[in-house]
Amino acid sequence: SVGFKAGVKEYKLTYYTPEYETKDTDILAAFRVTPQPGVPPEEAGXAVAAESSTGTWTTVWTDGLTSLDRYKGRCYHIEPVPGEKDQYXXYVAYPLDLFEEGSVTNMFTSIVGNVFGFKALRALRLEDLRIPTAYIKTFQGPPHGIQVERDKLNKYGRPLLGCTIKPKLGLSAKNYGRAVYECLRGGLDFTKDDENVNSQPFMRWRDRFLFCAEAIYKSQAETGEIKGHYLNATAGTCEEMMKRAVFARELGVPIVMHDYLTGGFTANTSLAHYCRDNGLLLHIHRAMHAVIDRQKNHGMTFRVLRKALRLSGGDHIHAGTVVGKLEGERDITLGFVDLLRDDFVEKDRSRGIYFTQDWVSLPGVIPVASGGIHVWHMPALTEIFGDDSVLQFGGGTLGHPWGNAPGAVANRVALEACVLARNEGRDLAAEGNAIIREACKWSPELAAACEVWKEIKFEFKAVDTLDK
């Protein structure tokens, strides 16, 4: 018998296996690999598979104490990226045994934890993941999901309306609560803490929670509708975060909020479990996502962060607008939206979806369109996002010349007009402006909003685009 053979071995000899047939239980990953000059794509692909699973830079004698064939990641297919020089799409299959059940943290630590600093690669991007149903079933997922949220709020047949309170920092708790009340009274369903509103010297969290709860109950009594404010429970420690969520539940409010990337997946999953057990909806903000997902050749796509969130748990998540000030190409954004809401999503490379994904009845997440949008965008948003969405107008509500409540009225009237027109069979894409103009005739608040924002557009090309 041959003894242990020390030394450095090419990765592709062990980890590049084009003949491998993937299993239903494998986690599949699609990477965009940019090898260093002189490194063949097969070696680069195999290096990714090795470094994100069982491999290290040299053979080690302890390899003989386990079954590498059972546990190793395998690069099973490589193809050039269309229209790009020296970039390859590498597909890697990971056996399910490599991952702790119910832990997004462990899944990411394995798949993207170490390999992105690897010297043989100039750049690396995780484009998509196929999560096997066997693994999905180890997660709770979103605390409630779309249908349960509608039933809790008693709101059907239209998108929900939100507003981020601005200025995001600097208001006292009482003035903040006042702004919340005006927006909710005017016809919005939700108002929102901004992502960096936590507990600062000018407004401690407990004071904010109390004044916002007062605003919610007062506006509910006046309008006869259920209202909510996304109370941001994000904090410096998990214990403090949970303390804030518990206080929100004691106040009887319907929804709390978390910054899931800066807060971390472990904290987020704990909060999602608490929210399901205690009947709280959970709004998720994606602060920090563009650090990870905006560059086209390095990092990971928002598609992957989105799937991770559905596993970890959240009832809403920001999803780009297609028409506002923040990044989001239409096809890519719609691909994201389907992965959040639908139970089964077919592979469709034209929308950036590399794998067919079956969510096996894991609850859906409502996409939130937010960032630089106003009443003139309403027809496009209604058409693009459909009913199961939250349309969030911060400046588009608070920037109204007559104040917050009229700003809220303008948005609600514009939304109701668009939903009515759609239900009557009109074409929102073609007739959008006409629909809004007609509605202005019986809403002076909407007419004033249309006057202020008639010419505003944010016209820049998206950075993260699809490969044609």
Swiss-Prot record:
The disulfide bond which can form in the large chain dimeric partners within the hexadecamer appears to be associated with oxidative stress and protein turnover. Keywords: Calvin cycle, Carbon dioxide fixation, Chloroplast, Disulfide bond, Lyase, Magnesium, Metal-binding, Methylation, Monooxygenase, Oxidoreductase, Photorespiration, Photosynthesis, Plastid. The record marks K325 as: Transition state stabilizer. InterPro entries: RuBisCO (IPR033966), RuBisCo_large_chain_AS (IPR020878), RuBisCO_lsu_C (IPR000685), RuBisCO_lsu_C_sf (IPR036376), RuBisCO_lsu_fd_N (IPR017443), RuBisCO_lsu_N_sf (IPR036422), RuBisCO_lsuI (IPR020888). It catalyses: 2 (2R)-3-phosphoglycerate + 2 H(+) = D-ribulose 1,5-bisphosphate + CO2 + H2O; D-ribulose 1,5-bisphosphate + O2 = 2-phosphoglycolate + (2R)-3-phosphoglycerate + 2 H(+). Pfam families: RuBisCO_large, RuBisCO_large_N. Its cofactor is Mg(2+). Transmembrane segments: none annotated. Its EC number is 4.1.1.39. Substrate binds at N114, T164, K168, R286, H318, S370. The modification N6,N6,N6-trimethyllysine is found at K5. The basic functional RuBisCO is composed of a large chain homodimer in a 'head-to-tail' conformation. In form I RuBisCO this homodimer is arranged in a barrel-like tetramer with the small subunits forming a tetrameric 'cap' on each end of the 'barrel'. Belongs to the RuBisCO large chain family. Type I subfamily. This is Ribulose bisphosphate carboxylase large chain. The lineage of its organism: Eukaryota, Viridiplantae, Streptophyta, Embryophyta, Tracheophyta.
